[in-house]
Amino acid sequence: FYAGLLDEITHFDPSFFLIPKEAARAMDPQALLVLEESLNLFSHAGYSLQEIKGSSTGVYLGARSQHQSEERVLHQARNPIVAVGQNYLASNVSQFFDLKGPGMVVDTACSSALTSMNLAINALVSGEIDSALVGGVCLLPDDSTHRLFQQRNLLSKESSFHIFDQR
């Protein structure tokens, strides 16, 4: 089957994001990826951390629930203060970058990122925010979900996606 694979997904510098190492180990890898990619986004767009700090920027993320490893579940039981739920994906970004707009995670299955973009556009048009960070994340730790989707004919025959394609 076809999949977009990420190398070194566990390589994360928690100290840069002011996250204790033990807390980072307990966090959903999607949260760590979203933090890293948000930093990349601002950097590639030419914004410094000082320029975006305190800005009226909303964070709108599409996300699917993440499988919890046994290690993360045990750590969360010992340290319930660690923000590990899917709803914290946007909050972590807003907090680290000191963004003052709304932060939300949307789960509408395959349309989560698109729905997030629609919400962000509406907030921009209404003047609720001045800028928006919009994205989507769905990390699958193994191939079981993909195989289930294949068995139920939820994927294309090529086992890859063809968004907005005539196929």
Predicted features, each with a name:
Residues 1-167:
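Cys-dependent condensing catalytic cores that perform Claisen condensation/acyl-transfer
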